[in-house]
Amino acid sequence: MAERKKLLITGAAGLVGSALRKYLRGRYDFRLLFHNNIPEVESEDEIVVSDTADFEQMVEAAAGVDAIAHLGIAVSKRGYPRSRYNRMVIETDINGTYNIFEAARINGVKTVIYASSNAITGRYETDGLLSTPEVTPRPRDFYGVGKAFGEALGRHYHDLFGLSVYCIRICNFPNTDEVNTKYEPGMNRWLSARDMAELAACCLEAKHPQFGIIYGVSQGSESKFDISNSLELVGWQPRDRGADPA
């Protein structure tokens, strides 16, 4: 039996991290990075308590892993003044993301999955236009600006150092596989936990080093997001579907 790959998950207590821990358990060995909220985990999981803003600790956390799923993000902006939240984005989504990519390079990590966001192309959505992986970023807020930096950094590390980098533009992710039968705003941007985990697995198992941007969204979003490249890049198609408008 082939030895299982070791996967470092940053932001492992978050919604996406929790979904990966649930659906990818048994397929990968986990090293889980938590900031301060540590949930109940399995005994075989490796635990790291740290902050992605600490470069030396990120280099240490990435030692000996095959891949990294970088899911750590700035907390919700609700309740924070704009200037303070923007500084949080710089610290987490810009400085922290640089630390992860550089730690991957230093340790010879082969693959990085970067939790990006449809916020990068949010202005296209506002204008009723189709968002594609190729269009020029038009972030709807400073969070989207931070994510655009991460994608550009991932492209740089692929081109210069040969890392496989997959930027998943995660859309509406409540970490559930259950869809209300009644349509609600945001359901046409919905990504199921199952689809998210399977997309991550497809990225981890892709055979050749490459850079890719993929919209993480389940079926029913065709008028907003172009996900046609996901099948060619990593062999992924969503299985689940959000509720349709009446």
Question: What kind of region is each of these model predictions?
Answer:
Residues 53, 88-99, 145-146, 191:
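Glycine-rich NAD(P)-binding loop of the Rossmann-fold in SDR/ketoreductase-type enzymes
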Residues 87, 91, 128-165:
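Catalytic helix-loop patch of NAD(P)-dependent Rossmann-fold dehydrogenases
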Residues 94-100, 109, 146-154, 196:
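Conserved catalytic Lys-bearing alpha helix of Rossmann-like short-chain dehydrogenase/reductases
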Residues 99-138:
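Conserved Rossmann-fold NAD(P)-dependent oxidoreductase catalytic core, especially the SDR/UDP-sugar
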Residues 170-177, 190-211, 219:
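Alpha-helical substrate-binding/gating segment
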Residues 212-214, 219-237:
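Conserved C-terminal active-site "lid" loop/helix of NAD(P)H-dependent oxidoreductases
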